Amino acid sequence: MPTPKKGARLGGSASHQKKILSNLAASLFEHGAIKTTDAKAKTLRPYAEKLITKAKSGTVADRRNVLALIPNKDIVAYLFDELAPKFENRAGGYTRIIKLENRKGDNAPMSQISLVLEETVSAEATRAARAAASKQTADEAQVEETPAEEVTEETAAEETTEAAQADEAPAEEAPVEEKKDEEK
């Protein structure tokens, strides 16, 4: 008897696994996020990402290939017309898996798989933002340095007046000390 090479199948047979993945992908595209077991979520991720990549190209052949995998025309139309344009700037990583608590009945590990619909930030945009932030902090540092110089001038002037007062005070105290010495 030949040994299995692919590992365990979802649902037992290969045909059942195909149907499970088709239904899970349809639900994911329809709702944006679904809650399922870890094994199903990990198996669904590459399947759904390949479908989204085909939807991004938007050709008739790709649409027919996706229709062969997901037989619901409404969901395929939604995938090609509304979801694919949202992923135009993203090169991959269209889905996200978040671990949840284990299921209550059988303690199965659960996950939420969802579509990542946030806008991607290009490396150039982050560099530009960092450059703008560094320029702003440099400008603030120059603004802070100018008042600091003025403050040092004021404190220097105060120190000179205090020094002058200190010079006068020992002169006044000196005769008092001499008087004490004279009294003895």
Curated annotation (Swiss-Prot):
| InterPro entries referenced in this protein's UniProt entry, alphabetically | Ribosomal_bL17, Ribosomal_bL17_CS, Ribosomal_bL17_sf
Q: Which Pfam families match?
A: Ribosomal_L17
* Lineage per the UniProt record: Bacteria, Bacillati, Actinomycetota, Actinomycetes, Mycobacteriales
Is Ribosomal protein a UniProt keyword of this protein? yes
Sorted alphabetically, the keyword list is: Ribonucleoprotein, Ribosomal protein
GO terms of biological process kind? translation
Location of the region described as Disordered in the Swiss-Prot/TrEMBL record: 126-184
Which family does the similarity line name?
A: Belongs to the bacterial ribosomal protein bL17 family.
Record-given protein name: Large ribosomal subunit protein bL17
What species does this protein belong to? Corynebacterium efficiens (strain DSM 44549 / YS-314 / AJ 12310 / JCM 11189 / NBRC 100395)
